[in-house]
Curated annotation (Swiss-Prot):
The keyword Transferase applies. The keyword Coiled coil does not apply. InterPro entries: Ac/SucOrn_transaminase_bac, AcOrn/SuccOrn_fam, Aminotrans_3, Aminotrans_3_PPA_site, Class-III_PLP-dep_AT, PyrdxlP-dep_Trfase, PyrdxlP-dep_Trfase_major, PyrdxlP-dep_Trfase_small. Keywords: Aminotransferase, Arginine metabolism, Pyridoxal phosphate, Transferase. Its cofactor is pyridoxal 5'-phosphate. It comes from the Bacteria. Coiled coil: none annotated. It holds the Pfam family Aminotran_3. This is Succinylornithine transaminase.
Amino acid sequence: MSLSVTRENFDEWMVPVYVPAPLIPVRGEGSRLWDQQGKEYIDFAGGIAVNALGHAHPALREALNEQANRFWHTGNGYTNEPALRLAKKLIDATFAERVFFCNSGAEANEAALKLARKYAHDRVGNHKSGIVAFKNAFHGRTLFTVSAGGQPTYSQDFAPLPPDIRHAAYNDLNSASALIDDNTCAVIVEPVQGEGGVIPATKAFLQGLRELCDRHQALLIFDEVQTGVGRTGKLYAYMHYGVTPDILTTAKALGGGFPIGAMLTTQDYASVMTPGTHGTTYGGNPLATAVAGKVLDIINTPEMQNGVRQRHDAFIERLNTLNVRFGMFSEIRGLGLLLGCVLQTEFAGKAKLIAQEAAKAGVMVLIAGGDVVRFAPALNVSDEEIATGLDRFALACERLQTGGASCG
């Protein structure tokens, strides 16, 4: 007999680095989840932009089960067929010539930053070690990546932090230009700042960063952990901008819910990462890469990417209609199915409260700071699920506006 568990057990048994919602999901199908009490939710959170094809997608289950019946793990002393096939698919679909597999976005960004430092040290000298990142960015929770992220709340308790990391203002080329020089080895940037408020970069900003990196022989790293694998209506967001990075990191949606990350780069840059310079026990394991290969097969199609753009329009239209009714948002922004609703001044700081009320109404949404409600639904979310979910979201907005909302 299995152990009966409740939300209270989390507080008893788990390290308290999270504050999970009161509900515990137990089953999912498509863009719907059900909790222990059988209550249904429309999922517009997508596991924070992870569940790109929803829950329990039959093709992903089949790919996982097929590989699970063969073998699970060998370690990095051996390669495997699913990893090689996935690497080739990523290379064929992007600028990349070499791929490094890991287990998460933080690990992918860690690998990218290490590569950039090593390339600069090997080709120029140890003095070329500076990294320029951006305020309010998020690149992961390792000591290196949390230092690159421009949110002191996440890093201030872990000093001393890795040195030679400076932060410019996002979408401000003058601010970046003041920091990038001949001692800079890398610039790391999100094409859309996700945790920082769902803020798309301007084309001029990314083009300017590309030019600055070329001028100072610095590597341009695009963190596409949240924007990658179809989320913006193209396979990767850099394809919207006509700006090609030197290194790209990807994770989240790549596995459709199964943990995987990857760093993509060119042969020249990859060449400095010789045997023993970096590694991972589980990265590129056959279970993860088999599932990710199927995810790419489904998402990297014109039909799916056109569908994302159509669903973007449907969300924007309905959210604008909702905003006419409630007047809660000063701006609705984003790319594809990564959307942010910025709260008006009178509702400032209440994004979490709206998310809590939304869950009570039967729809899951995210926040991006205290003032932005974030949506990252499955890329194949249906018209009916969009309509039902946003009707439920409207109930949450109504409760907040009329003063009926309460914490907890």
